């Protein structure tokens, strides 16, 4: 991997879905200290908004493993479900055999397990209110919605971060 961009200093994720369940998309970006931005996203035919939120975060965590990053990096998201699940609920779910407090099977267990596997020390999730003018949140929302609707969108992408639609 090239180090030409320096450390990752910021990241953002979002998910979108039409119908819930229905066609969905996710969008993400990472910012490097040299000012460059890497954007990526994906599409699923039959999914939910929550699955797309989790997928976006998972894809960012996978990318973060390959780069130097700010030791206090925060992944910004407008999904309280993602934040609460990743930061708090997952500990109890694992202790209870992936059951909720009411005894039901945890939804999206496959993605929660993958997120836990790719968890990185000192990387936390940070809430940003959706559609509040935050530029990174607005951009990843645009990416997620475009992918969910199969609308072409130009992504900022360097050669070492691959994007396929």
Curated annotation (Swiss-Prot):
It is an enzyme of class 3 (hydrolase). GO terms for biological process: DNA replication, removal of RNA primer. It is found in: Cytoplasm. One of its GO terms (cellular component) is cytoplasm. Its cofactor is Mg(2+). Residues 5-149 form the RNase H type-1 domain. InterPro entries: RNase_H, RNaseH-like_sf, RNaseH_domain, RNaseH_sf, RNaseHI. Gene3D superfamilies: Ribonuclease H-like superfamily/Ribonuclease H. Endonuclease that specifically degrades the RNA of RNA-DNA hybrids. Monomer. This is Ribonuclease H.
């Amino acid at each position: 991997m090239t180090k030409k961009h320096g450390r990752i200093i910021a990241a953002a994720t979002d998910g979108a879905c039409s119908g819930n369940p229905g066609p969905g998309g996710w969008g993400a970006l990472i910012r490097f200290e040299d000012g460059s931005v890497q954007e990526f996203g994906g599409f699923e035919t039959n999914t939910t908004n929550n699955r797309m939120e989790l997928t976006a975060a998972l894809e960012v965590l996978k990318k973060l493993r390959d780069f130097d990053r700010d030791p206090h990096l925060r992944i910004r998201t407008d999904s309280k479900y993602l934040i609460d699940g990743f930061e708090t609920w997952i500990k109890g779910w694992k202790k209870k055999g992936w059951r909720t407090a009411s005894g039901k099977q945890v939804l999206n267990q496959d993605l929660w397990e993958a997120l836990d596997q790719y968890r990185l020390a000192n990387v936390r999730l940070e809430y940003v209110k959706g559609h509040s003018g935050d530029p990174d949140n607005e951009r990843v929302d645009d990416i997620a919605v475009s992918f969910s609707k199969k609308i072409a969108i130009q992504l900022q992408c360097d050669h070492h971060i691959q994007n396929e639609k």
